[in-house]
């Protein structure tokens, strides 16, 4: 759990990739500049991890539990392959049936939405999984740490998702320009599913931390099957149809997914709903306030101004509801402190 080293490796490898890409482009490498950028980033990351890790491979030794580790890793790799297939099939289908233009709108909307959500979920996952693994023999501490982490995830992602739903047009126009306006509908529909997606993603924490990757592959494959089905159901209606059906499946499957992941732990529905309830209600309240504001200002101010004012109102109303009406200010501050303390002590 040397997160400072990991952060330094990620930042430095990204910088190496950027420099290589720029230099390659200056020397007229064309599209190969992009290839070289990604390759150099991966190579720099590998070198950084190798230098930062004290362990070195040696000769194989019998009787050290390799078989169980291979089973754990094999199931985890299997889930990653299946999940990767599902995450990319929508692009393949839309491009094949509706062409490059529709694929461009869909892909741009999806990537724009996922960018901020990943910046929240990825660091939390990097901290939560090893911490939970250390706590798996202490059921109550495991449960408390997971629920606190889940609450923090939803605290940040719920208002962000609702903000994207309400001000999708303004976001697309301000960030991408009017030529991408057709992507706003897809962006809005995907953002609806993004309300539940970060919650469902934490199910993976429970599976991995408790060594139940076989169940992760089993139930994850069911979820992938539902997602793939949603793509085919929505495909006749273009990118909007795929986005709508995908979000519906995410909203519906998240709850069985959480049930299967939590049933071998002390995490229960009362705890889950308690962790996510106030942030979701606060985000919905703030979303309604921004929706009213958008209706009043849409035809009087530029899109960027509506976006800026909407962000201020969203944040103010959300914090007012969660911190003061629900009285959660002290609890969230203490949660952040305890997560940081648990993460450091479990190292």
Predicted regions and their residues:
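Interhelical loop/hinge segments that connect adjacent transmembrane helices in multipass membrane
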Residues: 4, 31, 47-92, 102, ...
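Short runs within selected transmembrane alpha-helices of multi-pass transporters and secretion channels
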Residues: 9-21, 34-51, 79, 83, ...
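Alpha-helical transmembrane segments of multi-pass membrane transport and lipid-handling proteins
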Residues: 19, 23, 27, 146-198, ...
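Helix-terminus/linker motif at the lipid-water interface of multi-pass membrane proteins
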Residues: 25, 84-115, 130-134, 164-179, ...
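Interfacial/gating helices of multi-pass transporter permease domains
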Residues: 31, 67-79, 94-114, 143-145, ...
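Alpha-helical transmembrane segments of polytopic membrane transporters and translocases
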Residues: 75, 90-92, 102-121, 148-155, ...
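Helix-loop junctions and terminal segments of transmembrane helices
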Residues: 109, 113-157, 204-209
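Membrane-proximal transmembrane or re-entrant/amphipathic helices at the cytosolic face
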Residues: 259-269, 290-347
């Amino acid at each position: 759990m040397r997160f400072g080293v990991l952060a330094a490796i990620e930042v430095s490898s990204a910088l190496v990739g950027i420099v290589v890409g720029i230099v390659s482009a200056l020397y007229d490498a064309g599209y190969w500049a992009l290839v070289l950028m990604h390759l150099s980033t991966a190579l720099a990351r590998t070198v950084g991890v190798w230098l930062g890790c004290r362990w070195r491979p040696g000769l194989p030794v019998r009787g050290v539990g390799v078989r169980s580790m291979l089973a754990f890793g094999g199931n985890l790799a299997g889930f990653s392959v299946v999940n990767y297939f599902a995450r990319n099939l929508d692009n393949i289908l839309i491009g094949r049936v509706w062409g490059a233009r529709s694929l461009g709108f869909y892909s741009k909307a999806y990537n724009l939405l996922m960018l901020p959500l990943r910046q929240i979920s990825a660091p939390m996952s990097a901290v939560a999984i090893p911490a939970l693994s250390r706590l798996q023999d202490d059921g109550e501490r495991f449960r408390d740490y997971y629920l606190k982490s889940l609450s923090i995830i939803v605290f940040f992602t719920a208002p962000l998702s609702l903000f994207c739903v309400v001000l999708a047009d303004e976001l697309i126009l301000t960030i991408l320009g009017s030529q991408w306006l057709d992507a706003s509908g897809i962006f809005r529909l995907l953002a609806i599913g993004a309300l539940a997606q970060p919650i469902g993603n934490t199910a993976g924490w429970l599976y991995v931390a408790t060594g139940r990757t076989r169940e992760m592959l089993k139930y994850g494959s069911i979820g992938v099957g539902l997602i793939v089905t949603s793509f085919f159901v929505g495909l006749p209606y273009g990118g909007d149809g795929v986005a709508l059906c995908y979000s519906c499946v995410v909203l519906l499957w998240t709850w069985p997914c959480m049930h299967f992941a939590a049933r071998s732990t002390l995490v229960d529905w009362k705890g889950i709903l308690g962790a996510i309830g106030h942030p979701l209600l606060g985000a919905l309240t703030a979303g309604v306030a921004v929706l009213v504001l958008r209706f009043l200002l849409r035809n009087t101010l530029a899109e960027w101004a509506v976006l800026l004012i909407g962000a201020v109102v969203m944040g103010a109303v959300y914090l007012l509801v969660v911190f003061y009406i629900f009285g959660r200010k002290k609890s969230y501050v203490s949660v952040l402190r305890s997560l940081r303390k648990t993460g450091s002590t479990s190292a």
